[in-house]
């Protein structure tokens, strides 16, 4: 019954967007050519202004403090039951947060490496949301998070193509849950509050929404607001960062750590010219690097 309801919801979403089967197939054929013609900036900048959300959860990453240990990547995989790719599967790997090593300068032992840690940007104006034909990708109206309804995803990968940050990954294989695959999983005891993802759908970073849900429920039960210090370690990548490079909080709270850091002269965002307004903000020492 549940599966039938999910199918009906997906069909309703298609009809709401006036997508017949024929039109949908034509759109599938055209999307690659359209995006190859450099339409991503147009998609991003043409979006209407969104209503302000109650919270604007964001992450600040200090590049000067990131040591490239990738503890963030490993802890994220454990928390969200993301399988580890073998050397043969690297092209089809799934990384909810990835660390890019961009360039290396100098010689050992005086080596300077530019590192770019990159989770989902949870954009204010996410192009992935507008290109999804079935409403599987959506923006949380209260928190501004860009999330995924896995049961609706049809695997068209429009969102993957539209994302200018490469933050979305297609699930090429069955998930590592139970049975014979149990011993192969990085985390043999999967997190019960993290939704399962199935073969043929897209997944990505959620800013650890399952942990945020628990904190919000606790604060509501106690009849109080969420404190900034409680938010800081909500994301598992923040909690396990050895260099203390990551910070998480609410940009709508002007006194929060992330708000103060975002207003500093060291702050910048990736591809700001696209108008996506990402909620991952980077800090760098401009005088030390080209």
Predicted regions and their residues:
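Long, compositionally biased charged/polar accessory segments in the mid-to-C-terminal portions
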Residues: 210-290
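Carboxylate/His-rich catalytic cores and anion/metal-binding grooves
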Residues: 73-102, 157-163
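N-terminal secretory signal peptides
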Residues: 1-19
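N-terminal export leaders
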Residues: 13, 19-40
């Amino acid at each position: 019954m549940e599966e039938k309801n999910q199918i009906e919801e997906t069909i309703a979403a298609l009809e709401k967007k006036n997508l017949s089967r024929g039109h949908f197939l034509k759109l599938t054929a055209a999307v690659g050519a359209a995006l190859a013609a450099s339409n991503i900036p147009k998609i991003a900048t043409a979006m209407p202004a969104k209503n302000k959300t109650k919270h604007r959860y964001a992450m600040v990453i200090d590049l000067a403090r990131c040591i490239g240990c990738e503890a963030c990547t490993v802890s994220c995989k454990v928390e969200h039951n993301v399988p580890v790719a073998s050397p043969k599967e690297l092209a089809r790997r799934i990384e909810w947060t990835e660390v890019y090593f961009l360039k290396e300068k100098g010689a050992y032992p005086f080596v300077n490496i530019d590192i770019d840690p990159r989770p989902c940007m949870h954009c204010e104006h996410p192009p992935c949301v507008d290109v999804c034909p079935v409403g599987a990708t959506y923006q949380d109206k209260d928190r501004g998070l860009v999330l995924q309804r896995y049961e609706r995803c049809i695997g068209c990968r429009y969102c993957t193509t539209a994302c200018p940050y490469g933050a979305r990954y297609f699930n090429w294989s069955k998930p590592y849950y139970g049975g014979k695959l149990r011993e192969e999983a990085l985390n043999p005891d999967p997190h019960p509050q993290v939704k399962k993802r199935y073969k043929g759908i897209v997944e990505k970073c959620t800013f650890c929404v399952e942990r945020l849900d628990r904190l919000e429920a606790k604060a509501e039960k106690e009849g109080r607001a969420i404190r900034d210090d409680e938010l800081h370690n909500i994301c598992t990548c923040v909690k396990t960062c050895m260099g203390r490079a990551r910070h998480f909080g609410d940009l709508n709270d002007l006194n929060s750590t992330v708000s103060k850091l975002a207003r500093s002269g060291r702050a910048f965002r990736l591809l700001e010219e696209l108008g996506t307004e990402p909620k991952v903000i980077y800090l760098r020492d401009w005088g030390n690097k080209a």
